[in-house]
Swiss-Prot record:
<feature type="binding site">
    <location>
        <position position="273"/>
    </location>
    <ligand>
        <name>carbamoyl phosphate</name>
    </ligand>
</feature>
<keyword id="KW-0665">Pyrimidine biosynthesis</keyword>
<dbReference type="InterPro" id="IPR002082">
    <property type="entry name" value="Asp_carbamoyltransf"/>
</dbReference>
<feature type="binding site">
    <location>
        <position position="117"/>
    </location>
    <ligand>
        <name>carbamoyl phosphate</name>
    </ligand>
</feature>
<keyword id="KW-0808">Transferase</keyword>
<feature type="binding site">
    <location>
        <position position="67"/>
    </location>
    <ligand>
        <name>carbamoyl phosphate</name>
    </ligand>
</feature>
<dbReference type="GO" id="GO:0005829">
    <property type="term" value="C:cytosol"/>
</dbReference>
<comment type="function">
    <text>Catalyzes the condensation of carbamoyl phosphate and aspartate to form carbamoyl aspartate and inorganic phosphate, the committed step in the de novo pyrimidine nucleotide biosynthesis pathway.</text>
</comment>
<dbReference type="InterPro" id="IPR006130">
    <property type="entry name" value="Asp/Orn_carbamoylTrfase"/>
</dbReference>
<feature type="binding site">
    <location>
        <position position="232"/>
    </location>
    <ligand>
        <name>L-aspartate</name>
    </ligand>
</feature>
<feature type="binding site">
    <location>
        <position position="274"/>
    </location>
    <ligand>
        <name>carbamoyl phosphate</name>
    </ligand>
</feature>
<dbReference type="Pfam" id="PF02729">
    <property type="entry name" value="OTCace_N"/>
</dbReference>
<dbReference type="GO" id="GO:0016597">
    <property type="term" value="F:amino acid binding"/>
</dbReference>
<dbReference type="GO" id="GO:0006520">
    <property type="term" value="P:amino acid metabolic process"/>
</dbReference>
<comment type="pathway">
    <text>Pyrimidine metabolism; UMP biosynthesis via de novo pathway; (S)-dihydroorotate from bicarbonate: step 2/3.</text>
</comment>
<protein>
    <recommendedName>
        <fullName>Aspartate carbamoyltransferase catalytic subunit</fullName>
        <ecNumber>2.1.3.2</ecNumber>
    </recommendedName>
</protein>
<feature type="binding site">
    <location>
        <position position="68"/>
    </location>
    <ligand>
        <name>carbamoyl phosphate</name>
    </ligand>
</feature>
Length: 327
């Protein structure tokens, strides 16, 4: 390929961002590199850009969200988009409208980007098949949460300088976590080594097939790791009793300094939020200004979502047809 041909290649050759699965290391690196530029832009007094001027972004969240929804809203507005937050609680969905009918209705309004979070795995891909615009998965069931994995990767890369060769332990409720799945896929693709640490009741069957090491003991699982990523107990997705009690869970799996001591001396701590202090993480560890990256993750989230919106918008046509489909 000539240099001229390379310049004609799209930054991110995908119409949608439905998951980390299917992305190449080059795709991931391109998004992270672009996000790096937005980190610096967001630290300026004038944060406003214009790459989405004239574009319409719809945020469609079927599940409650603080960080992700506000982050996408801020990202779109900083890029100059017209942003609409659709309230599902007051929409036709509450009157029995199907997801497909919702998709067809929204598509008729000619949006350019739809960001969707849904409680059912696969719902985002279904919607993407019915619309003409670009779709971004903001979390679907226990399936994927791609922008969370990207922001976690950016946070790690900016602090450690790389992803390849790092040992990352993901600890907690792996069974119900879309964050865990997306992070496993991304970290493996970028050459990191991934461990999962959890009681057997909170691990999905066949998790080893994703290329992770499995531990049931925190001391052994954290031995020599570079990054400790804690996950909350997703009680809202639990139909039965997965742990004896939250107090006992913290005793065995909650991250405190005693357990963190098994990791490398310069190991860093992450959490996608929201946190349950005293359940999966001790407050002192969560608030440690030297070792906790939790606040940095929030900052990186806006930059990553700006990068994703920017990258997808470059592939948008100037005129959108009524008939939809995914590519």
């Amino acid at each position: 390929m000539t240099s001229a041909e390379k310049q004609l290649q799209p930054l991110f050759p995908h119409r949608h961002l439905l998951g980390i699965e299917g992305l190449s290391p080059t795709d991931i690196t391109s998004l992270l590199d672009l996000a790096d530029t937005y980190v610096e832009q967001n630290r300026q007094v004038d944060k406003k850009g214009s790459v989405l001027r004239g574009r319409t972004q719809i945020n469609l969240f079927f599940e409650a969200s603080t960080r992700t929804q506000s982050s996408f809203e801020l990202a779109g507005k900083r890029l100059g988009a017209d942003v609409m937050n659709m309230s599902v609680s007051s929409s036709s969905v509450k009157k029995g409208e199907t997801l497909i009918d919702t998709a067809v209705t929204l598509n008729a309004m000619h949006p350019d980007l739809i960001i969707i979070r849904h409680q059912n795995s696969g719902a985002v891909e279904l919607l993407a098949q019915k619309v003409s615009c670009s779709v971004i998965n903001a979390g679907d069931g226990a399936h994927e949460h791609p922008t969370q994995a990207l922001l976690d990767a950016l946070t790690i890369r900016r602090r450690k300088g790389r992803l390849q060769g790092l040992i990352v332990a993901i600890c907690g409720d792996i069974l119900h976590s879309r964050v865990a799945r997306s992070n496993i896929l991304l970290l493996n693709a970028m050459g990191a080594r991934v461990r999962v640490v959890a009681p057997p009741t909170l691990l999905p069957a066949g998790i080893e097939r994703l290329g992770v090491e499995v531990f049931h003991d925190m001391a052994k699982g954290l031995e020599g790791v570079d990054i400790v990523m804690m996950l909350r107990l997703q009680l809202e997705r639990m139909a039965g009793s997965y742990v004896p009690s939250q107090r006992e869970y913290f005793h065995f799996y909650g991250l405190d300094y005693a357990k963190l001591a098994h990791a490398k001396p310069d190991a860093l701590v992450m959490h996608p939020g929201p946190m349950n202090r005293g359940v999966e993480i001790d407050s002192a560890v969560a608030d440690d200004i030297d070792r906790s990256l939790i606040r940095e993750q929030v900052e990186m989230g806006v930059a990553v979502r700006m990068a994703v919106l920017d990258a997808l918008s470059r592939n948008l046509p100037n005129e959108l047809p009524l008939a939809g489909g995914r590519s």
